[in-house]
Amino acid sequence: PAKYAKAAKREINHQVYELIFKNSKIFDGKALFDADTHKNVLATGCEPSIEAVQALMLLLMQQTDPFGNAINVKPKNMILPLGYGFKAAQIFQSQTVNTPENTQAFNALYQYRNNIQIIEEGELNVLAGGAPVPWFVSADPKQVGSVKVDYLNGNKRPIFRRSEKTGYLGFFWDIYMDWVVSVKDW
């Protein structure tokens, strides 16, 4: 039974990242990541770099509510496929960076080293197969809505029911869990 409980948790994780990775349409009929309406995606795909991270963080911090008012969200998580964590550590933990003129310059992202949580998620690599793997910056879910997992009756653990049947040795198990993955906001 414990293996089934772990499998259910892995399936929830898979569904969350699948929704993000496949850029599903959300409640407004637009894709979750949409340059025109949501303004939450870079123009071209790239691996994490100081410039790309700064651009994505600015897009996040410039988000507005449906009435056009600034909502002042701060970046909290950097969600990366396996392998980009090394690059992220270099981006956030280096006080200085090399410039094209071969000099040292202050790394503006160094100040965020204690505020941004790096999340390396292998599910992104699996979903991408051999294709390029996207990465994401998100706000604190306590500050704004994001991807949410809701559970039937708030029960976050699988329900186990054991039964016996006359004439059979051993037990029969019913193991079930109900959840839904949804997007509250972009």
Language-model segment annotations:
Residues 65-72:
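Short, conserved, surface-exposed binding loops centered on an aromatic residue
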